Structures are given as structure tokens and as C-alpha cells.
Amino acid sequence: MAENKYMTFKPSSLVFAILILPLLAQSAELSVTSRQEIDLLLDRLGSSSCEFYRNGTWHSAAKAHNHLNRKLAYLLDKHQVGSAEEFIEIGASKSSVSGKPYLVRCNKQPEIPSAFWLRRELDLIRVNAAAQTARKN
């Protein structure tokens, strides 16, 4: 059987992979646009008439805004968020303490998972941004 020079295992390759993987895992950088989207998202939540359920208790929209801002700051410090979607997935959809999902309830409507509410609002933010860009052009 012929030896394939491209498939040969080199111990130095393993060492390189071990050293570089942690750096790649922590390389999430938030773009200016993503940060603006998250800020708008949290502002929409904070100024809404919705309630936010976490760890067994309903909280006001203002308290939800403050809580999620603290989680965002922590995640940014740890380089764990690179987009609005990642923030929703990692920081705004469930408790990092209990693992229980966050819920949102607006205007006496049935509660829904916060991830659904936030993604829907993010879609609206993006539609509005695209419409503003189109009007400028």
C-alpha cells in the first residue's frame, strides 16, 4: 500500500491543534451592527409592557432589560457572543443557573419562550433597518 504524504500524522500537528483550539473558541467578536441590534432588542424588551419569567418569578420588562444587560456584559467579557443570534441562544433564552427557559408574557397573551419573542423582535429590527437603508438609496 502506498504511503500518502498528506495523511501522515505528525505529533507537531496535534500540539498545534491543542494550543490553537482554545484561542479559536474564545475568538467571538461582536460587530458594531450586532451590538446595535442587541441594544435595540433589549431596549424594545425594556420599554415593552411585557413581563419576563426567570427562575420561578415574573419580572418587569425593566428588570428583564437590566438582567439581560448584565448577562451580555459577562458574555462579552468572556468573548462568548459574536452575533445577536448567539446572544439570544447563549444568554437570553434560559437561566445559566437553573437551565430553565425564560418566558415572555405580553398584554395578557399566553407566555412564549423568550428566544421566540427575541428572534421575532430581531427580525423586525432588521426589516426596519433594511427599509431605512432602502429609503436612503
Task: Specify the residue positions occupied by each region the protein language model found.
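Bacterial N-terminal signal peptides that target proteins for export
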Residues: E3-L14
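N-terminal signal peptide c-region/cleavage motif recognized by signal peptidases
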Residues: I20-A25
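Compact alpha-helical subdomains of small soluble proteins
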Residues: G56-N137
